[in-house]
């Protein structure tokens, strides 16, 4: 399975080449494939904030490379680079407040600096750590894909119709995706007959990104309006909803793309199983429940400005980017560390704190 998945990999969104971070600008997809070259931390933070790069894992990876660029700048300035670098940590942390992987990556980079030995080259050490973060995410994608497809096979042995929402694919990770990784594996194994993708307003990650990724790989995909998804579950024989996560609280509540919560409610009503696929770095045990997850809200212009012209004036806009799906609506959370069915505080604590002999 691993070799087949790697052979099928066609889309990548993050490259570290020649001492610069190259990001596929996801704001322009699918009409234009343009790469942004970031050679300083301000450009990386802007790319994260403005959603040129998006997806929790991808944001964390980009931030790690952003710190490498920041350190290079600080060393060239010749001042107190350790003190100055704190400003860069803060700049990156503030770019997208909901993505748990962002803070995990920044903390891991900070810990690497604290372990620095006197004889080590600080820039080389930090660059190696960023590369390791990138590579570990790719490996996590592979593991999650294999675990997720085993769950789907166990539930029903024949080819199935799956529904996904948002974009939790190669564009949102360092590999070939979390939710879409499971879907890709399922298609290769003959377990997925068709994928339905919700458009995912207002940024249209489903129609612009997920449908584009799946079509590029020849996976049968049907695009649906967000308002049609409950009807879809009722009429099209959907067996699983498979989504990613931006942050998972200690009790199993999941923050994901706005609209995921209502999708989970519909899935529960229609007897459709609900799977969340996310690396363990998305789990924050310091957040007791979903109520503690900071939920980003974006500018009203994303709803009021269409094609450069105002659609309506003098109205207020509520534009949250994420919502929280309660743990009791989730059948299973798939991570690279293992699978948690019917998640709760005890099960997630056991997953994260599990002692390993090897």
Swiss-Prot record:
It catalyses: 5-(methylsulfanyl)-alpha-D-ribose 1-phosphate = 5-(methylsulfanyl)-D-ribulose 1-phosphate. GO terms for biological process: L-methionine salvage from methylthioadenosine. Its EC number is 5.3.1.23. One of its GO terms (molecular function) is S-methyl-5-thioribose-1-phosphate isomerase activity. Keywords: Amino-acid biosynthesis, Isomerase, Methionine biosynthesis. Pfam families: IF-2B. It comes from the Bacteria. Substrate binds at residues 54-56, 96, 205, 256-257. Pathway: Amino-acid biosynthesis; L-methionine biosynthesis via salvage pathway; L-methionine from S-methyl-5-thio-alpha-D-ribose 1-phosphate: step 1/6. InterPro entries: IF-2B-related, IF-M1Pi, IF_2B-like_C, Initiation_fac_2B_a/b/d, M1Pi_N, NagB/RpiA_transferase-like. The active site is at residue 246. Transmembrane segments: none annotated. Belongs to the eIF-2B alpha/beta/delta subunits family. MtnA subfamily. Catalyzes the interconversion of methylthioribose-1-phosphate (MTR-1-P) into methylthioribulose-1-phosphate (MTRu-1-P). This is Methylthioribose-1-phosphate isomerase. The gene is mtnA.
């Amino acid at each position: 399975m691993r070799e087949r998945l790697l052979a099928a990999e066609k889309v990548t969104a993050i490259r570290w080449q020649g001492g610069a971070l190259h990001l596929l600008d996801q704001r322009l997809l699918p009409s234009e494939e343009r790469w942004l070259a970031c050679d300083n931390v301000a450009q990386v933070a802007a790319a994260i904030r403005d959603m040129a790069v998006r997806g929790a894992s991808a944001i964390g990876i980009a931030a790690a490379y952003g710190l490498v660029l920041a350190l290079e700048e600080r060393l060239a300035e010749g001042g107190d680079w350790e003190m100055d670098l704190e400003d860069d940590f803060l700049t990156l942390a503030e770019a997208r407040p909901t993505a748990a992987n962002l803070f995990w990556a920044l903390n891991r980079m900070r810990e690497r600096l604290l372990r620095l030995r006197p004889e080590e080259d600080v820039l080389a050490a930090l660059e190696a750590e960023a590369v390791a973060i990138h590579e570990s995410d790719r490996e996590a994608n592979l593991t999650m894909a294999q675990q997720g497809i085993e769950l789907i096979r166990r539930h029903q042995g024949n080819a199935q119709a799956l529904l996904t929402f948002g974009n939790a694919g190669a564009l949102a990770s360092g590999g070939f995706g979390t939710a879409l990784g499971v879907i890709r594996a399922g298609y290769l194994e003959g377990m997925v007959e068709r994928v339905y993708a919700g458009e995912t307003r207002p940024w249209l990650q489903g129609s612009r990104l997920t449908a584009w990724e799946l079509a590029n790989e020849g996976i049968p995909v049907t695009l649906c309006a967000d308002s049609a998804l409950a009807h879809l579950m009722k009429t099209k024989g959907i067996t699983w909803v498979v989504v990613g996560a931006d942050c998972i609280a200690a009790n199993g509540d999941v923050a994901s793309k706005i609209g995921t919560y209502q999708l989970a409610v519909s899935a529960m009503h229609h007897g459709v199983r609900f799977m969340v696929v996310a690396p363990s770095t998305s789990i924050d045990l310091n957040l007791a429940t979903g109520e503690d997850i900071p939920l980003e809200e974006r500018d009203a212009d994303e709803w009021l400005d269409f094609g450069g012209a105002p659609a309506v004036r003098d109205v207020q806009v509520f534009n949250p980017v994420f919502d929280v799906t309660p743990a009791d609506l989730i059948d299973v959370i798939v991570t690279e560390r293992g699978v948690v069915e019917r998640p709760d505080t005890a099960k997630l604590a056991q997953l994260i704190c599990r002692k390993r002999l090897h």
